[in-house]
């Protein structure tokens, strides 16, 4: 017998499987829609999508005991590197119809994969753009509550800072998935993470840093706040 209960983060749920193992899930905003072949659970008349931590760095962070999750119902999110929408679809479930995701993606081919998803998920606005040039999409993106970044670039930290400068509300939060090998393959991941933390701390208050193993190798997730 599968059971669903609320997670400590609003909009996130815990699914207790037949074998007693726990998984995380979000309540499907668009019942019947699957985004990346995820498992769907029906429970008390609602549909829940299992959030696969092997396919989503944010999912991995929650599974690893993330303490700060500023993405909440009704919030606006600038998502840098939205790709084909795997993680964004769960964020869309969490923020609900009152919330909004502005998703920046550099690759037209990848963005095209997002189109069928957003036809039903009107709280996602896909934008073709370059996250290293935040002024490019100024006409399309308002001030937001949260910026989430998943861009495998050497200048990852600078990208978050530059976008926060333009789009993040005062007191708003940034979340960044850092892949150490994208920044410097010659350094130990721990050294790269320390350098990223130092760079972020010059602009933000760094609230949390979390390793994403075993789901993602050489990755960490940082949560920061704009003061």
Swiss-Prot record:
<dbReference type="GO" id="GO:0008033">
    <property type="term" value="P:tRNA processing"/>
</dbReference>
<protein>
    <recommendedName>
        <fullName>Fibrillarin-like rRNA/tRNA 2'-O-methyltransferase</fullName>
        <ecNumber>2.1.1.-</ecNumber>
    </recommendedName>
</protein>
<dbReference type="GO" id="GO:0003723">
    <property type="term" value="F:RNA binding"/>
</dbReference>
<feature type="binding site">
    <location>
        <begin position="150"/>
        <end position="153"/>
    </location>
    <ligand>
        <name>S-adenosyl-L-methionine</name>
    </ligand>
</feature>
<dbReference type="InterPro" id="IPR029063">
    <property type="entry name" value="SAM-dependent_MTases_sf"/>
</dbReference>
<dbReference type="GO" id="GO:0008649">
    <property type="term" value="F:rRNA methyltransferase activity"/>
</dbReference>
<dbReference type="InterPro" id="IPR000692">
    <property type="entry name" value="Fibrillarin"/>
</dbReference>
<keyword id="KW-0694">RNA-binding</keyword>
<keyword id="KW-0808">Transferase</keyword>
<dbReference type="GO" id="GO:1990259">
    <property type="term" value="F:histone H2AQ104 methyltransferase activity"/>
</dbReference>
<comment type="function">
    <text>Involved in pre-rRNA and tRNA processing. Utilizes the methyl donor S-adenosyl-L-methionine to catalyze the site-specific 2'-hydroxyl methylation of ribose moieties in rRNA and tRNA. Site specificity is provided by a guide RNA that base pairs with the substrate. Methylation occurs at a characteristic distance from the sequence involved in base pairing with the guide RNA.</text>
</comment>
<comment type="similarity">
    <text>Belongs to the methyltransferase superfamily. Fibrillarin family.</text>
</comment>
<feature type="binding site">
    <location>
        <begin position="130"/>
        <end position="131"/>
    </location>
    <ligand>
        <name>S-adenosyl-L-methionine</name>
    </ligand>
</feature>
<dbReference type="InterPro" id="IPR020813">
    <property type="entry name" value="Fibrillarin_CS"/>
</dbReference>
<feature type="binding site">
    <location>
        <begin position="86"/>
        <end position="87"/>
    </location>
    <ligand>
        <name>S-adenosyl-L-methionine</name>
    </ligand>
</feature>
<keyword id="KW-0698">rRNA processing</keyword>
<dbReference type="Pfam" id="PF01269">
    <property type="entry name" value="Fibrillarin"/>
</dbReference>
<comment type="subunit">
    <text>Interacts with nop5. Component of box C/D small ribonucleoprotein (sRNP) particles that contain rpl7ae, FlpA and nop5, plus a guide RNA.</text>
</comment>
<keyword id="KW-0489">Methyltransferase</keyword>
<dbReference type="GO" id="GO:0000494">
    <property type="term" value="P:box C/D sno(s)RNA 3'-end processing"/>
</dbReference>
<keyword id="KW-0819">tRNA processing</keyword>
<feature type="binding site">
    <location>
        <begin position="105"/>
        <end position="106"/>
    </location>
    <ligand>
        <name>S-adenosyl-L-methionine</name>
    </ligand>
</feature>
């Amino acid at each position: 017998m599968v059971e669903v209960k609320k997670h400590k983060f609003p909009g996130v749920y815990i699914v207790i499987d037949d074998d007693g193992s726990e998984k995380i899930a979000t309540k499907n905003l668009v019942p019947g829609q699957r985004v990346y072949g995820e498992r769907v659970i029906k429970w008390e008349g609602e549909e829940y999508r299992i959030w696969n931590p092997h396919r989503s760095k944010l999912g991995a962070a929650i599974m690893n005991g993330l303490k700060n999750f500023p993405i909440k119902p009704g919030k606006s999110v600038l998502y840098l590197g939205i790709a084909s929408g795997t993680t964004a679809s769960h964020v869309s479930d969490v923020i609900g119809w009152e919330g909004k995701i502005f998703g920046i993606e550099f690759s037209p081919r990848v963005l095209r994969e997002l189109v069928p998803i957003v036809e039903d998920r009107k709280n996602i606005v896909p934008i073709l753009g370059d996250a290293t040039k935040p002024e490019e999409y100024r006409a399309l993106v308002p001030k937001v509550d949260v910026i989430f970044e998943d861009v495998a670039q050497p200048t990852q930290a600078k990208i978050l800072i530059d976008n926060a400068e333009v789009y993040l509300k005062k007191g708003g939060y940034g979340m960044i998935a850092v892949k150490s090998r994208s920044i410097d393959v010659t350094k130990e991941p721990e050294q790269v993470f320390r350098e990223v933390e130092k760079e972020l701390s010059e602009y933000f208050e760094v609230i949390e840093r979390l390793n994403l193993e075993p789901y993602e190798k050489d990755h960490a997730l940082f949560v920061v706040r704009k003061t």
